[in-house]
């Protein structure tokens, strides 16, 4: 039987390995977009308005005695940037959705969202496959999606 310190060390080592793999995948995504000349943006995490999608519940917080909502997606802010004349953009960010808790769900998770001007459906599909391919370590899986 293992003692508590041994279990803690095992958990720390597992989490450290997961963190390293996650960091590498995010780095690969950033490298891909940099090669494609896509600008990384950073939009606000809070808003005075909740999301209008009836299937998504926003998380409300209080800031300076007023209600704010944590973003469920950076979509609205990113589309605002597009309307201001930004070109191709992407963002890797934390988003929040109430009632998304379960064995494989968390109310807080990381999302990647990107917009490409002048891409048709085929271009978007290829872009998505390229992003997936850059984070997959098994080459046999890459051949199946491209």
Residue ranges and their predicted role:
Residues 31, 133-134:
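Short, acidic/charged, Gly/Pro-enriched secondary-structure junctions
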Residues 134-146:
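Metal-assisted phosphate- and nucleotidyl-transfer catalytic regions
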Residues 125-132:
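Short amphipathic C-terminal alpha-helix that caps PH/PH-like domains
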Residues 1-123:
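Class II aminoacyl-tRNA synthetase-like tRNA-binding/catalytic domains
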